[in-house]
Regions:
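Conserved motor-region signature of P-loop NTPase helicases/translocases
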Residues: 1-73, 246, 253, 259-260, ...
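Accessory C-terminal helicase-associated subdomains
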Residues: 206-211, 217, 387, 483-597, ...
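C-terminal, charged and often intrinsically disordered regions of DNA end-processing helicases
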Residues: 375, 379, 409-411, 491-494, ...
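Short, polar/flexible loop-turn hinges at active-site or ligand-entry regions and domain interfaces
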Residues: 52-57, 77-86, 102-116, 128-143, ...
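Conserved C-terminal motor-coupling region of P-loop helicases
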Residues: 2-8, 247-248, 462-488, 529-721, ...
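A basic/glycine-biased coupling hinge at the interface between accessory DNA-binding modules
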Residues: 5, 23, 45-235, 253, ...
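Metal-dependent nuclease catalytic regions and adjoining charged, substrate-binding loops involved
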Residues: 689-707, 910-997
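Non-catalytic protein-protein interaction segments used by genome-maintenance enzymes to assemble
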Residues: 843-916
Length: 997
């Protein structure tokens, strides 16, 4: 008996009916674990065994490459080598084949290529770089809207909304708002005027018109380059089969039998393709299988109506419902059925495994505790001999995956990411790129300085830190490292000199082929210094990835330079591109993935974490205001969507399932259990309260690793790095008084102690951001005007600003043009609104300092503008570029009882004037140079009283005491990223990389 016959005999009655019904349209509603893949494969085998059809006349379409591979493997087992002739393909791959054959119907002169991810990055970057964008390219973060633009354009295409239609609907909404009587205020000061909220809506929609222009340019540039993106593919193929009778006939004649997997995930475009080819065929042999309860691709245009429509569109369709589940226990299936009922079939899933264990619902204080508990649970299972491949943690979002992976790795648990490891997630990637930058530019002081702190430099930590503290240079270069041979603190061939020599040997190979140079760097610095076999394997994989990137870059560019390659890599990194590390083998580990990605998989043990209303039900807000017509057509995250996703997640579990949630987020905000879980009957769960779960965690913490500690100092102590910490602390205590205490120093210290350490203590050079360069150019121009009391003409002003921007390191002519225009507008507004009102007796950019004898430190500040008014008052002004801050933000006292950075600055200036001149500052003000004309926050004015001075002095004393007592590393990091990003603190990341290496 063949394997096919053996497997066929195992089928139940309804499964056999699905396999045996090979003629006409058939729709199978197959719940999770009911043998869907098995049925598809056996049905293809049945067709080949009972008809004289050739294997290449069968078309099987699915949605993922993994689905294609699974089907091909199953067919090979059942049918043998003949199965290779069966056309098993994803929708997109099949569509591309049709496009390659009939591309002339799309008015392409040659076959269009599918745009690669890196090509898309550079195309978008080029459009943003060369366009005149007021909104889409923020100065603080030019790449800010990259993913939002991609996502919105993708959705518009899947909904088949053209550029013209999108623009028309935006203008229609604006016109309606402008003319709607309800838009006019009927009371108060604004009576008769457009309401403020309506003004904001109109302004937001007007900004979205920039997206229209971007969309138009993006499409034009793709077509000019004979490119198509992922969403074009299906639209193009529908256009071909709709307009070409030859193409339709070709497909229909080639494929007598069509099978579609996961049909509930079909989008409107995919459905249109099936209807265009087989819609006019009487009784077509189309077989679709899916489950309405597992529709989780609504974001990509999938809609339940397309699945339901099949039953009626292709004539008398046979409907078969499969409810016998061979995966999960009854308790798991009962819970799943309570969450969601099928809208197509009646009946509940029936388990062939029996009752099984109850599902746990666990409550925790914080989200991190959920993952710690899951990790400890899996750790105990591993110790009992359970297979790692049977364990999975499912979470709502991708960022939860990254956090969970990090926590599990800190528990020394093996983790197998569903996605390959990203090159940009590795610390050694930054190290490698630094070496390349030094070879490209040996006088790159930022890269040279940071390279000394790299693990791979071979330099002792304290030795590197002492060298940097004693050589506080803005222009530290490779030559300085080579000069360190026989002079200074270190003898002859010390580690700093050796590192310089290694870099010099690589610099001497700069003219070699790029891929050869990268191979040399990899071998000399990484592979040859591997600590053990595991480290060697990781380093080989890492270096192979870089060599592969270099080889690809060489094929696209003739004689590429290091600088060009660095620019290529940096752009990919900036835009969040994912580059897989080229792994040599498949490792084993706990699988961590989103609920969405778990579809089609199964595990004995499943832990579903972060089941909070605020987390699970949250949608990413679009930065673009959309017209009502488009909003109504876009998929919204409803209760039903969430239920389907949870249904899929729970039915991944074969025997054991746990759900967990937290009460508080990381910032202390309240969290609640997801409402769709709260609504479920208690009978489905064994509930474990927060105090019970915390007790378990504490017991494990006493008997094992300190799972509640995550500070750098605690992690360093765990890794046996206490000597290094003691040395660094003593090194700081001995030398911190050499650095003057300024308000920027204090602000850095209380934001993040490691920001202070690297910026103010070691004074590591840093690349200057575009915003800082603009701020410096504006401040320098204002200082020039104030000191010389000359109003420059427009051309002179532009020339002065341009020169200053170049001094600040801006070399791109287009960037200079953009920044120069912004700076000129700021200065012109300053001259019109502020300069004319300055007191006659004033001084600008005045440095003030004094020695605090009690603390033994110099306190210092530079005041932008000091005015002595005619009535004897002193007015201090600090000029600020960037978005204006509200009175509340400036006057806010933080949770430690400290002043905001802005108020601390004003308090410092008043204190300095009092100590150095024995005079009181009467008025302290912040003038925001980039405010809108009608912004009430353009100037903040206050008087610094003794209470604020006392808070400033407390900050200074706390600063000194924490350094003297070695407590500064214990301080909490309060870093907040700018420009809409949610990045981790770069200074803490650098510290972890150094102290935990």
């Amino acid at each position: 008996m063949s394997l096919f016959e053996q497997e066929y005999k195992k089928l139940n009655k309804l499964q056999k009916e699905a396999v045996d019904t090979i003629e006409g349209p058939v729709m199978v509603v197959a719940g999770p674990g009911t043998g869907k893949t098995q049925i598809l494969a056996l049905r293809i085998g049945k067709i080949l065994k009972t008809t004289d059809i050739n294997p290449d006349s069968i078309l099987c379409l699915t949605f993922t490459r993994s689905g294609v591979n699974a089907m091909k493997n199953r067919l090979l087992q059942y049918i043998g080598l003949e199965s290779n002739k069966v056309k098993v393909s994803t929708f997109h791959a099949f569509a591309i084949e049709i496009i390659e054959k009939y591309y002339t119907f799309l008015d392409f002169p040659q076959i269009p290529n599918l745009i690669k991810e890196d090509e898309a990055v550079f195309l978008v970057d080029d459009i943003l770089e060369n366009g005149s964008w007021d909104y889409l390219r923020p100065r603080t973060n030019p790449q800010m809207y990259f993913n939002d633009l991609k996502s919105l354009i993708s959705i518009l295409k899947r909904e088949r909304i053209t550029v013209e239609e999108f623009e028309k609907q935006i203008k229609k909404d604006i016109e309606f708002l402008e003319n709607d009587p309800e838009s006019i205020s009927s009371r108060g000061e604004s009576k008769g005027k457009v309401k403020k909220e309506i003004e904001k809506k109109i302004e937001s929609l007007s900004r979205t018109l920039e997206v229209v222009e971007f969309y138009r340019i993006y499409e034009e540039r793709k077509r000019e380059s004979f490119l198509m993106d992922y969403d074009d593919v299906l639209e193009f193929v529908v256009s071909i089969v709709s307009n070409s009778e030859d193409a339709r006939a070709d497909i229909y004649e080639n494929y007598q039998y069509v099978l579609v997997d996961e049909h509930q995930d079909s989008s409107g475009v995919q459905n249109s393709f099936l209807k265009a080819v087989w819609g006019e065929v009487e009784n077509p042999n189309i077989f679709v299988v899916g489950d309405d309860r597992q529709l989780i691709y609504a974001f990509s245009g999938a809609n339940l109506s397309y699945f339901e429509e099949f039953a009626n569109y292709f004539g008398r369709t046979k409907l078969i419902t499969l409810l016998d589940n061979y995966r999960s226990t009854s308790r798991i299936l009962d819970l799943a059925d309570s969450i969601l009922e099928s809208s197509i079939s009646k009946g509940k899933l029936k388990s062939n495994k029996g009752g099984g264990e109850s599902v746990f619902l666990r409550e925790y204080e914080y989200p991190r505790d959920e993952i710690l508990s899951a990790g400890l649970y899996f750790k105990s299972l591993i110790e009992q001999g359970e297979s790692l491949e049977e364990m999975a943690i499912l979470v709502p979002k991708n960022h939860h995956v990254r956090t969970a992976n990090s926590i599990l790795k800190n528990l020394n648990l093996p983790v197998l990411d569903q996605d390959n490891l990203s090159l940009f997630s590795l610390n050694k990637t930054d190290s490698f790129l630094r070496v390349l930058r030094i070879i490209d530019k040996p006088f790159d002081s930022v890269s040279v300085s940071l390279s000394l702190l790299d693990k791979y430099s071979g330099i002792d930590k304290l030795e590197a830190h002492r060298y940097l503290e004693e050589n506080k240079k803005e222009n530290l270069s490779l030559d300085n490292l080579l000069e360190n041979r026989e002079t200074g603190l270190f003898a002859n061939e010390n580690n700093i000199f050796k590192w310089g020599k290694t870099l010099k040997s690589l610099l001497d190979k700069k003219d070699k082929k790029l891929s050869f140079l990268i191979s040399e760097i990899g071998n000399i610095i990484y592979i040859n210094n591997s600590e053990d076999n595991h480290d060697l394997l990781e380093n080989v994989e890492f270096v192979r990835t870089f060599i592969h990137l270099a080889l690809m870059f060489e094929t696209k560019n003739l004689n590429p330079t290091i600088g060009q390659f660095l620019n290529y890599i940096e752009r990919l990194k900036t835009y969040g591109n994912h580059i897989d590390v080229a792994t040599l083998g498949v490792s084993k580990g706990i699988q961590v993935m989103t609920l969405h990605k778990s579809k089609g998989l199964e595990y004995k043990y499943v832990w579903i974490a972060h089941m909070n209303e605020e987390t699970f039900m949250s949608e990413k807000r679009s930065p673009f205001a959309l017209p009502e017509y488009v909003r109504d057509r876009l998929a919204k995250r409803s209760q039903e969507d969430a239920k389907r996703e949870l249904y899929v997640a729970i039915t991944r579990a074969k025997e054991y399932c746990t759900l967990s949630y937290a009460n508080l987020n990381y910032t202390g905000g309240e969290l609640n259990l997801a409402s769709i879980i709260q609504e479920l009957p208690d009978i489905h769960f064994i509930k474990k309260r927060k105090d019970e779960n915390e007790l378990e965690l504490l017991e494990n913490s006493i008997n094992g690793p300190k799972i509640f500690t995550s500070s750098i100092i605690d992690l360093a102590l765990e890794k046996g790095e206490s000597r290094v910490l003691d040395e660094i602390n003593e090194f700081v205590r001995e030398n911190y008084k050499d650095t003057k205490v300024s308000v920027s120093l204090l602000n850095n210290f209380f934001e993040c102690p490691f920001k202070w350490y690297f910026r103010n203590f070691l004074k590591l050079p840093e690349p200057k951001s575009v915003s800082l360069a603009l701020g410096s150019a504006v401040h320098n121009t204002i200082e020039f005007i104030l000191k010389n009391k000359i109003l420059p003409k427009a051309k002179e002003l532009e020339s002065f600003i341009n020169q200053d921007l170049r001094k600040e390191g801006i070399s791109n002519d287009k960037e200079i043009l953009r920044l120069s225009k912004t700076a000129s507008n700021i200065i012109e507004d300053f001259l019109a609104s502020f300069y004319k009102n300055i007191a006659k007796d004033f001084s600008s950019e005045r440095s003030v300092s004094f020695l605090d004898k009690d603390l033994g430190i110099n306190i210092y500040g530079k005041i932008d503008l000091t005015e002595n008014t005619s009535d004897g008052r002193i007015v201090i002004t600090d000029f600020k570029t960037g978005k204006p801050k509200t009175k509340t933000e400036i006057e806010k006292i933080d949770e430690e009882g400290r002043l905001s950075a802005y108020m601390r600055q004003l308090a410092m200036y008043s204190y300095l004037v009092k100590q150095s001149q024995n005079r009181e500052v009467d008025i302290s003000q912040l003038f925001f140079l980039e405010r809108e004309h009608n912004d009430k926050n353009k100037v903040y004015i206050t008087n610094i009283d003794n209470e604020k001075i006392d808070l400033l002095l407390r900050d200074i004393k706390d600063y000194v005491e924490s350094l003297e007592n070695h407590h500064w590393m214990d301080r909490k990091c309060n870093f907040k990223s700018f420009g809409g990003k949610n990045d981790p603190c770069p200074y803490c990341a650098l510290a972890k990389n150094i102290f935990l290496k």
